[in-house]
């Protein structure tokens, strides 16, 4: 089957030529029929993928979680498989794949939020604001991989809890929330293990929420989330569902796998076994060296 490598120039920066050459070398070694599409602007992603939608290919994101998300949103409904070469900043989707010992070919769940899709995590509240503010912090003196931590500190001082309500068959809540997280995968924020027991093929979304937390309690909770031990915390509530509706008092940013959408109403539902994951560890390890 043809392998289509979608290379995100912005994820690679100076490594673009090196990674592209490695892909060519490895594909020749493994006798893989391949095409490389280099994306220089986000709005060119759709055009690059359009010619592959009416045939069956393996579409491989060469980038981070944002690249995976944009490819997913363009190939849903087609017969294409989805793969990833993790060369982005966070690579949380790939971390989840490794932790779950995913097969080389495996049908996995996808979630739909309004008219978009996500494969890993959607979050509202302080988590989403941290992710959004990371893109604002463009000081070149701060290494890219440290900008999330800088944003975490910046957001800590600026953040105000969100007025919201959510409804599912399993639970209904309203009030002020510090965070609401809907997890299909396990990690977000570059290695924070928000949903340590989540599975891509269990047919369920894991929902976590914290109501109106005081700021002095946040550092301790963040440390627990990093370790994946927060499920025992009294500040965090969890349940599982297949569908949830969230309404917010004001327009609010929702972070979905490194991208953002803004609205006051969000309907999220699970689409079981909606896409085939291609997890060729030999290919990935050889390309990454």
Model-derived segments and spans:
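Short glycine/serine/threonine-rich phosphate/pyrophosphate-binding segments
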Residues: 66-70, 92
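A generic structural signal for short beta-strands and their flanking turns/coil linkers
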Residues: 160-162, 176-178, 201-206, 240-244
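Catalytic core of DAGKc-family lipid kinases
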Residues: 6, 37, 79-178
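ATP/nucleoside-binding phosphotransfer catalytic cores, i.e., glycine-rich phosphate-binding loops
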Residues: 168, 174, 199, 210-289
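Gly/Ser/Thr-rich active-site loops/lids in small-molecule metabolic enzymes
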Residues: 138-146, 196-216
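ATP/NTP phosphate-donor binding region
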Residues: 1-59, 69, 77, 171-172, ...
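Glycine-rich phosphate/pyrophosphate-binding beta-alpha loops
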Residues: 123, 127, 181-194, 260
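Short conserved active-site loop signatures built around small residues
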Residues: 65, 180
């Amino acid at each position: 089957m043809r392998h289509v490598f979608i290379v995100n120039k912005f994820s690679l920066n100076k490594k673009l030529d090196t990674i592209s050459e490695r892909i060519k070398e490895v594909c020749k070694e493994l006798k893989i029929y391949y095409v490389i599409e280099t994306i220089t602007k986000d709005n060119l992603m759709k055009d690059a993928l359009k010619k592959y939608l009416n045939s069956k290919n393996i579409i491989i994101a060469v980038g981070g979680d944002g690249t995976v998300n944009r490819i997913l949103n363009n190939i849903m409904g087609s017969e294409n498989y989805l793969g990833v070469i993790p060369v982005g900043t966070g690579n949380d989707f790939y971390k989840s794949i490794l932790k779950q010992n995913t097969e080389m070919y495996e049908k996995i769940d996808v979630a739909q939020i309004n008219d978009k899709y996500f494969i890993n995590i959607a979050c509202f509240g302080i988590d989403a604001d941290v992710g959004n503010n990371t893109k604002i912090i463009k000081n070149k003196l701060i290494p890219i991989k440290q900008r999330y931590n800088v944003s975490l500190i910046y957001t800590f001082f600026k953040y105000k809890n969100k007025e919201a309500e959510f409804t599912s068959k399993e639970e209904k809540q309203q009030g002020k929330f510090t965070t609401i997280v809907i997890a299909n995968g396990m990690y977000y924020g570059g290695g924070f293990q928000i949903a340590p027991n989540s599975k891509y093929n269990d047919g369920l979304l894991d929902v976590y929420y914290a109501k109106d937390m005081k700021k002095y309690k946040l550092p301790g909770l963040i440390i627990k989330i990093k370790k994946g031990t927060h499920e025992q915390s009294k500040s965090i509530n969890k349940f599982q569902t297949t569908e949830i509706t969230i309404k917010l008092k004001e327009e609010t940013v929702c972070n979905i796998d490194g991208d953002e959408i803004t609205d006051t109403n969000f309907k999220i539902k699970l689409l079981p076994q909606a896409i085939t994951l291609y997890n060729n560890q030999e290919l990935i390890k050889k390309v990454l060296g």
